[in-house]
UniProtKB/Swiss-Prot annotation:
Belongs to the D-isomer specific 2-hydroxyacid dehydrogenase family. PdxB subfamily. One of its GO terms (cellular component) is cytosol. Gene3D superfamilies: 3.30.1370.170, NAD(P)-binding Rossmann-like Domain. It comes from Pseudomonas syringae pv. syringae (strain B728a). This is Erythronate-4-phosphate dehydrogenase. The gene is pdxB. Homodimer. NCBIfam families: PRK00257.1. The lineage of its organism: Bacteria, Pseudomonadati, Pseudomonadota, Gammaproteobacteria, Pseudomonadales.
Amino acid sequence: MRIVADENIPLLDAFFAHFGEIHRLPGRAMDRAAVADADILLVRSVTAVTRELLEGSPVRFVGTCTIGTDHLDLDWFQQAGIQWASAPGCNARGVVDYVLGSLLTLAEIEGVDLAQRTYGVVGAGQVGARLISVLKALGWNVLVCDPPRQAAEGGDFVSLDEILQRCDVISLHTPLSKTGASPTWHLLDDARLRQLRQGAWLINASRGAVVDNAALHDVLLEREDLQAVLDVWEGEPQVNVALADLCILGTPHIAGYSLDGRQRGTAQIYQALCGFLDQPATIELDDLLPKPWLAQVSLDAACDPVWALNMLCRGVYDPRRDDADFRRSLTGDTASQRLAFDALRKQYPPRREIEGLKVRLEGESEALAQLVRALGAVLV
């Protein structure tokens, strides 16, 4: 069996070597020649897996080690009898850590009390739902917009326009789609961006084209009261440098790049491939993850929850380093910028998640215990 895989997928040998020969190559370099004799294709979001890529090849299983599937031609897969799998939720905790770290950083820069802000979460899937749980555990005011879930469940959802009008902080966590009942391509276009309330913060850690980047540039140029945090960009790996210059924080699509999340994604695709091949899944991720540098934290039950959040979050992640590295990469010509964007992702240093922390509470505090559980950490 021949496996063609994105070279940046972690633990390829540990999970897949026993299935057959692994041929590694850059995700953006995959073409028809590369998959001409492949049985299994393993990718990330940078590879568009389409009919044009696979038609005529022997590929019968495609696994993407990512949450999203907008880079897969699922309709054609069904027609061609190609099985596929994604890794839903694999890096959700890492993205939540990124958003929380960004909020803490902006609060420090602007001298804002986070508890006094109203939060709008657009998209309540794997990432959004976890973020909502943390914000509510802190007792903060949260509004949620998710039209597909609202249509299916009813419940306490609001419209996107209400989010824009009422919320001081808006965090986007939608998939990218151009069709269907709720398309998200340019969900925030020029008209909607101009509805942002005075002093609003906009965070996009979903897909770049959920926000019209050209329109956002123009709005930020006109309105100095707004702040934007962007981890994703239209046209990646090319970045709108003028837009990046206007963002208070900018990073190269690494919000979900925690070590745990990336390796969890590989493990989920391994399990799916075992199912496809009707083989037992005998390899466990817990046996492969390295020990975290910070394993346990003690908190006094009397401490302020926001202080506790800051300690736990900063213990694993601070977005300012990634922002600085990203800005240093935005020099030179267009070709060098594109290479630098991918290099930052390929060479990304190990980053763990709050979920891996063990937290000991000295004393009793249900509020702190609820926060720790919402963050995914373990009370001991």
